[in-house]
Amino acid sequence: MLKGNLAGLMKQAQQMQENMKKMQEQLAQIEVEGQSGAGLVKVTMTCRNEVRRVAIDPSLLADDKDMLEDLVAAAFNDAVRKAEATSQEKMSGMTSGLPLPPGFKLPF
């Protein structure tokens, strides 16, 4: 009986690994947009943290360089937070049946 349970667990683990791979491929296609300065700076990235686009309103180009750098950093950080939240939401469906501790983050 123990062998049967172990085989079942191994099969479950293999299926979950395949599902995780598919989910990673999907997350690589999902884009999120971070903004700062009331939308004057926008960073678009995938849920795998690959930046696709950076858009800067032309009105900022003549302004203070330090302020522009801060706005770009803030937009990037906003995009990262959105990517993490989207990834967590998508992954929660896959891990809902697993006995994981609260707040446990998978390493992807």
UniProtKB/Swiss-Prot annotation:
HAMAP family registered for this protein in UniProt: DNA_YbaB_EbfC
Pfam families reported for this sequence: YbaB_DNA_bd (PF02575)
Assembly notes: Homodimer.
Protein name: Nucleoid-associated protein Bcep1808_1753
This protein's UniProt keywords: Cytoplasm, DNA-binding
KW Cytoplasm (keyword) present: yes
Superkingdom as given in the UniProt entry: Bacteria
GO cellular component annotations of the record: bacterial nucleoid; cytosol
Gene3D superfamilies: Nucleoid-associated protein YbaB-like domain
Location of the protein in the cell: Cytoplasm, Nucleoid
UniProt feature, compositional bias: Polar residues: 85-95
Matches recorded under NCBIfam families: DNA_YbaB_EbfC
InterPro entries: YbaB-like_sf, YbaB/EbfC
Native source species: Burkholderia vietnamiensis (strain G4 / LMG 22486) (Burkholderia cepacia (strain R1808))
Single GO MF descriptor: DNA binding
Family as reported in the entry's similarity comment: Belongs to the YbaB/EbfC family.
Coiled-coil intervals: none
PANTHER family, per the entry: NUCLEOID-ASSOCIATED PROTEIN YBAB
Chain positions covered by the region annotation Disordered: 85-108
UniProt keyword Nucleotide-binding present: no
Composition bias, Pro residues: 99-108
Record's function text: Binds to DNA and alters its conformation. May be involved in regulation of gene expression, nucleoid organization and DNA protection.
